[in-house]
């Protein structure tokens, strides 16, 4: 059974990501890969980490052994209609890939204009690059994840900063095999990146670095701004360059040179006088959500306020979950979905935005306030800050459950005196 000594755990805690860099530089065997995966596991999960065994890596990296056991398939609805097929790894493989994904992100810095699945970048930072422009030009890359085969992934791992070349080339192939899967693509079987594997987005950022560099150079040449969020590429400019034959031909040439294909059906030129959208956000003047997004939040909060939680939850399950299809049948899905939508709204509009603040106050009234949050602020920032936070929501009762199952009901007087 694989274990770390107390001294080794202390070293992992002290060095963290630096230890991953050190260990990857000297990677020479499958046992070395196992060690670095387990280091990542400890960094990610601490005391809860369950260390991998070499047999796990060998099994899941060998398609002959594990092809039928690696992935399960499901579909999700697209906003534009139709369905998207997702190939998701089984739990054991998912754990391995999450650790390798962390390792890849430690070792590799994506291009500055790669905005998807990168720490401290998001759909918001992507959209911000294209605000208040006369023209916004969107293109989509066809069958994006499935365009990257195992050999291409192996090649990338042989380059800087991974350098698994020469005598270490078999390790590059082994890791590439771990991250790819045999899928039927347009009538033929190919070993490619699955859409649903934790490593696939990061690996596409690695593999698309030359594409990002060339397209960013093209944008600069024509006085435009470029960015890419996964398969969604955006150019924006105040000049009318997007009907320029030289620009369009060079764009197509660069994409084809990287063995990728533009999905012509999804190419859009958006002018200032009409609504301009980038990665699901409006960018005409500033980054904003669709009106429908806020309208839907208000609707569900209104249902809670008017009909009560039980009926509102029933309406939510009937309509929203039916629409999305892939949402899990959780104990309280409405609360989780509304929380997620509010966090997204906060990310887009900012924590001080009036619309966000009003909606979050209604949410707190509807679901009850987080007593632990108040008490933490009370301890760290004083009673006045805690009272101010409480007064924004004004729930009827504040309930905190202890380990024995008993609860304490705090009134407004308890908090403010």
Please name every model-derived segment:
Residues 231-237:
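Short beta-strand->loop micro-motif that forms the acidic, two-metal-ion catalytic signature
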Residues 1-76, 86-139, 144-165, 169-170, ...:
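Right-hand nucleic-acid polymerase module
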Residues 141, 230-231:
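Short acidic donor-binding/metal-coordinating loop in glycosyltransferase active sites
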Residues 80:
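ATP-binding glycine-rich loop module of kinase domains
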Residues 225-228:
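Short beta-strand
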